[in-house]
């Protein structure tokens, strides 16, 4: 197919702008983030070493591999989550019956005695391994470790939450989340994935993702807000499903990872709004939906990135206006749950302003 010369010129100019944006803005963000991660991980490693001395069941899994720390997720420029993987989930059955959107419970296997579990004192009368009880014990240990740490003058534990959150150097907030890795199984609540009749992802990648599995995190879930006491109690024992590794595997190939880096940079520069209605994780999920809409690798060539970003922001505007953002693997889970309607409304206006600038100004990326 012949392409008009003026279209080729416009496309070439856009690719140049995008490359320059990546070289300047995106790389600057990545450098700043990696510097922050290195700084906080050195401190958290020291604290977790002390925790392990006090309680050997909490073995630190925060290690550096090929120049990067495994299990660290960037929530925003100054907020991070570190996952601490626990051992010996084996005597429990994984149960996700849809009662708690985005969550599952771990129930003592039939015929297994409590004493066979490494986590015996955290098992409820009903035989569930309580996420909240483990987190409470871990929080106490971390608080004690902070008092003993050589970094105690620059680390404070944030006390108004059931989660383990540290404030480091009055600049960073770091959440440390106990978790179990669930390999070789796939949750029933995500059984619909991948969608039939969509050629992405390739069956080999689907098999890889399902074999890799998912994580169960000990953290609060917005899905259970305003529930009755019984449901709230059950939610305290439940574990939050996380597909962090699966998502990263799916974004390999083409310029998908590059697209995500640009989305995160645009978010940090223009969508850091009161009430934090839009996170990098919202954008990551919408990027996965965009991959389904555009399943071919050539649709993720560098010449197409601007179109993909515009498509994702138009999706985001729609989600903000309808006040619902379905999780990619768990569509019944609304990721806007708990966000104020006014914050979502203001965010929709700001995203539209940003999108309109990108759609109407051929040189938009020079000043974004």
Curated annotation (Swiss-Prot):
It comes from the Eukaryota. InterPro entries: Mab-21-like_nuc_Trfase, Mab-21_HhH/H2TH-like, MAB21L/cGLR. Gene3D superfamilies: 1.10.1410.40, 3.30.460.90. Belongs to the mab-21 family. This is Protein mab-21-like. It comes from Drosophila pseudoobscura pseudoobscura (Fruit fly).
């Amino acid at each position: 197919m012949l392409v008009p010369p003026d279209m080729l010129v416009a496309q070439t100019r856009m690719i140049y702008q995008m490359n320059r944006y990546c070289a300047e803005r995106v790389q600057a963000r990545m450098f700043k983030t990696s510097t922050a991660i290195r700084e906080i991980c050195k401190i958290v490693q020291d604290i977790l070493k002390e925790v392990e001395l006090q309680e050997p069941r909490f073995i630190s899994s925060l290690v550096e591999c090929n120049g990067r720390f495994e299990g660290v997720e960037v929530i925003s420029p100054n907020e991070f989550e570190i996952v601490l993987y626990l051992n010996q989930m084996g005597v429990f059955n994984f149960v996700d019956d849809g009662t708690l959107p985005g969550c599952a419970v771990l129930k003592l296997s039939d015929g297994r005695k409590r004493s066979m579990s490494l986590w015996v004192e955290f098992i409820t009368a009903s035989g569930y391994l309580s996420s909240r009880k483990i987190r409470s014990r871990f929080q106490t240990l971390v608080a004690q470790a902070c008092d003993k740490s050589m970094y105690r003058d620059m680390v404070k534990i944030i006390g108004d939450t059931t989660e383990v959150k540290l404030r480091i150097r009055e600049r960073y907030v770091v959440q440390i989340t106990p978790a179990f890795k669930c390999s070789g199984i796939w949750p029933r609540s995500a059984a619909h994935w991948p969608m039939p009749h969509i050629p992405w992802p390739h069956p080999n990648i689907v098999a890889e993702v399902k074999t890799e599995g998912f994580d169960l995190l000990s953290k609060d879930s917005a899905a259970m807000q305003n529930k009755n006491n019984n449901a709230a109690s059950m939610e305290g024992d439940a574990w939050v499903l996380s597909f962090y590794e699966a998502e990263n595997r799916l974004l390999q190939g083409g310029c998908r990872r590059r697209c995500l880096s640009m989305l995160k940079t645009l978010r940090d520069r223009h969508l850091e709004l009161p009430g934090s209605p839009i996170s990098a994780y919202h954008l990551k999920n919408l990027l996965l939906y965009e991959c389904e809409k555009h399943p071919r690798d050539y649709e993720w060539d560098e010449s197409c990135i601007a179109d993909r970003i515009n498509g994702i922001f138009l999706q985001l505007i729609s989600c903000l206006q309808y006040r619902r953002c379905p999780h990619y693997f768990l569509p019944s889970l609304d990721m806007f749950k708990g966000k104020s309607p006014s914050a979502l409304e203001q965010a929709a206006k700001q995203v539209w302003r940003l999108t309109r600038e990108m759609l109407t100004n051929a040189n938009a990326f020079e000043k974004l």
